[in-house]
UniProtKB/Swiss-Prot annotation:
ATP binds at T54, V55, G56, G57, A58, G59, K60, T61. Its EC number is 2.7.1.130. The lineage of its organism: Bacteria, Pseudomonadati, Pseudomonadota, Alphaproteobacteria, Hyphomicrobiales. It catalyses: a lipid A disaccharide + ATP = a lipid IVA + ADP + H(+). InterPro entries: LpxK (IPR003758), P-loop_NTPase (IPR027417). Keywords: ATP-binding, Kinase, Lipid A biosynthesis, Lipid biosynthesis, Lipid metabolism, Nucleotide-binding, Transferase. Belongs to the LpxK family. This is Tetraacyldisaccharide 4'-kinase. Pfam families: LpxK. GO terms for biological process: lipid A biosynthetic process; lipopolysaccharide core region biosynthetic process.
Length: 346
């Protein structure tokens, strides 16, 4: 899977997209066959997959956290399942935020582990079994929708309202991970984050296909202290411009930005540049929670950058406050029906 989305994926399709179309067609065929025909293992407990249509960020991780909070409110013990992208460990691992680093398990699992039991595993089937053995009674899988390794009891596809599906082309012509029709067929519901127009066409198509549609916003968790502050905003995430908009919405004056690749591990020179530039201009450094975990536990100038950077925390808040609980309940009902069918009673 492509890890970085080139800028032309997010604009109207041009000659580059069309030049790559033969490769995209072949990629799409393979992806469709895998999604439709692969033998999926049955998870030991109810499983929600939080995925997206495209390469890159759409808000899956904060959505997964919101669902875990709803599960805990129901008296359940949720467990997160992640492949651990960006981490080096290739064995099934229960993530310990006090022990593991982003280089070990990936940055997103460290964020998830602050909320609930989290397992990283290259083989998601093994990871699901480990979560159940650790006491999880519902699994929330962060990404992996197109992998076709596990049966989902509920598949929620997240789409950003400002980016949508980019130019709508398949990898490598565009950011789409598998043919839209195949993805919709395997989806239970869509979650549109934000109120921009870029996702509307796909949302209407999904609604016509009978898929449930949810809407949410990304909400800042700040105390207003950023208002009027001159900042150097830095981020190594899939959509840094979205973060910079969030910083501006917090009232900060964004004097400069520094963007890095998603899941980027910072070099000493990059760290020194951020610290020295902010100090010379009198700017406050500000970043994302996901970037901060890649600095912790840090030493030397990495620790200095972590200490000098402010984090703007965010959460996903559904327009319908009951929506996360409804998703949990639907997942539990689907899992019960799945088990009845497996036992020959459905």
């Amino acid at each position: 899977m492509v890890s970085e989305a080139p800028p032309f994926w997010w604009t109207k399709a041009d000659w580059r997209a069309y030049a790559l179309w033969p490769f995209a067609w072949a990629y799409g065929r393979v992806a469709a066959i895998r999604m439709d025909r692969a033998r999926r293992a049955m998870p030991p407990v109810p499983l929600i997959c939080v995925g997206n249509f495209t390469v890159g960020g759409a808000g899956k991780t904060p959505t997964a956290i919101a669902l875990a909070q709803a599960a805990k409110a129901r008296g359940l013990k949720p467990g997160f399942l992640s492949r651990g992208y960006g981490g080096s460990l290739d064995v099934t691992t229960v993530v310990d935020p006090g022990h593991h680093r982003a280089r070990d398990v990936g940055d997103e699992p460290l964020l998830l582990a602050r909320e609930a039991l989290t397992v990283v595993c290259r083989r998601r089937v093994d990871g699901a079994r480990r979560l159940a053995a650790e006491g999880a009674d519902i699994i929330i899988m962060d990404d992996g929708f197109q992998s076709a390794r596990l049966t989902f009891d509920f598949a929620l596809l997240v789409i950003d309202s400002m980016r949508g599906i980019g130019n709508g082309h398949l990898v490598p012509s565009g950011p789409v991970r598998a043919p839209i029709a195949d993805q919709l067929r395997h989806a239970t519901a869509l979650l549109k984050i934000g109120h921009g127009p870029a996702a509307d066409r796909l949302i209407r198509r999904a609604a016509r296909a009978g898929k449930a549609i949810y809407v949410a916003d990304t909400v800042r968790l700040d105390d207003g202290s950023m208002s009027g502050v001159k900042v150097l905003a830095w981020a190594g995430i899939a959509d840094p411009e979205k973060f910079y908009r969030t910083v501006r919405d917090a009232g900060a004056i964004v004097e400069e930005t520094r963007s890095f690749p998603d899941h980027h591990h910072f070099s000493d020179d990059e760290i020194a540049d951020l610290i020295d530039r902010a100090a010379s201009q009198g700017y406050t450094l500000v970043t994302t929670a996901k970037d901060m975990v890649r600095l912790e536990p840090g030493h030397g100038r990495a620790a200095e950058l972590a200490a000098k950077s402010r984090v703007i925390e965010i959460e996903v808040r559904f327009d319908d406050p009951l929506a996360p609980a409804k998703i949990i309940d639907a997942t539990l009902a689907a899992a019960r029906a799945r088990k009845l069918r497996a036992n020959g009673k459905g």
